[in-house]
Amino acid sequence: MFRFGVIEGKAIMSKKAKQTAIVLSQQMLAEGIYDLWLATELAKEAGAGQFIGVYPKNAATLLPRPISICEVNEDKTALRLVYRVAGKGTKEFSSFEKGDTVEILGILGNGYRVSELLAKNPEFMEITLYGGGIGIPPMLQLSKELAAAGRKPSVFIGYRDSNLFLKEDFEKYGTVYVATEDGSVGTKGNVLTALKETAVQPSVMMACGPMMMLRAIRQEASERAIPAYISLEEHMACGIGACLGCVCRTTKKDEHSQVHNARICTEGPVFLAEEVEI
């Protein structure tokens, strides 16, 4: 089975370079959630499931803020970041305007590598994606890459209420099913509630969202005897694997360190669900 993060026993390290990006546009999609487009050469290297570090301009704030890549434009000259304001750094980002410059670090992490995934797993006929909350944006680029490969996915996205940010974007690339906590749109409940109301029979599950959701996805995949790939989100410091601040427990020992650990920022953020303890 295709395993993320390791090829021939060696961890894959993404190319990393600090660069200056230019703000192309920014808008608020929902309360506290912003849609930011950045012009950057790093877009040429970006893929589904990866992320960049965005540096605040405040000199007192040294560390970049990790933000998942939502989308890469067609000519690979710009990155789309959809993020939630969660602290001083992201609050500063929400004030960016067209023409502003910002320092970024990337491209970071190991993502889905769609072409390799599909080549190694021809049995993945019904590909299903699951996004919850701010875990929704990273699934858009994955949907886009799957559709480009001729494998339009079934996409299950979960919201708190009727603020369905990015729903229309997902509809360009796959069949979309919505779940809302308050029942205002679609299925009342979560993404798995929505799945069980359809005739969709997944051959693989791919997810990003709250930890409770990821645990449920892992359990559902286990019961169906199919693989699940989950994108883990964790507080990060360096973003390049040096500080060990984003380690997760694994079910297997690392061949080199001989410990049951993996760094989310380098070996992840995408993991085969059965290989991590969550």
Predicted regions span which residues?
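Local cysteine-cluster metal-coordination motifs and their immediate loop/turn environment
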Residues: M211, E234-P269
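Structural signal for conserved beta-strand scaffold positions within catalytic alpha/beta enzyme cores
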Residues: S25, E71, V178-T180, I230, ...
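FNR/FR-type flavoprotein reductase catalytic core
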Residues: K88-H235
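N-terminal amphipathic/basic-hydrophobic helices that include classical n-h-c signal peptides
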Residues: M1-I12
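Ferredoxin-reductase
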Residues: S14-K98
